[in-house]
Swiss-Prot record:
The keyword Oxidoreductase applies. It is an enzyme of class 1 (oxidoreductase). One of its GO terms (molecular function) is glutathione peroxidase activity. Optimum pH is 6. Glutathione peroxidase which may protect the cell from oxidative damage. Optimum temperature is 40 degrees Celsius. It catalyses: 2 glutathione + H2O2 = glutathione disulfide + 2 H2O. Keywords: Oxidoreductase. This is Glutathione peroxidase.
């Protein structure tokens, strides 16, 4: 569901990588060990071309 409580159709994100907030900490720990970087950025703040 969306923050508003409305149903969210995940099909609209087909082909994209999604990071589920509940798993962020686990992913960060795993990726840090592998030398990767996980960063959280606001979705539209940097949407400039």
């Amino acid at each position: 569901t969306e923050l508003s409580g409305a149903p969210l159709d995940l099909y609209q994100y087909r082909g994209q990588v999604l990071l589920i907030p509940q798993f962020t900490g686990l992913l960060y720990q795993k990726s840090q060990q592998e030398g990767d970087v996980v960063d959280g950025l606001p979705s539209h703040q940097f949407h400039q071309y």
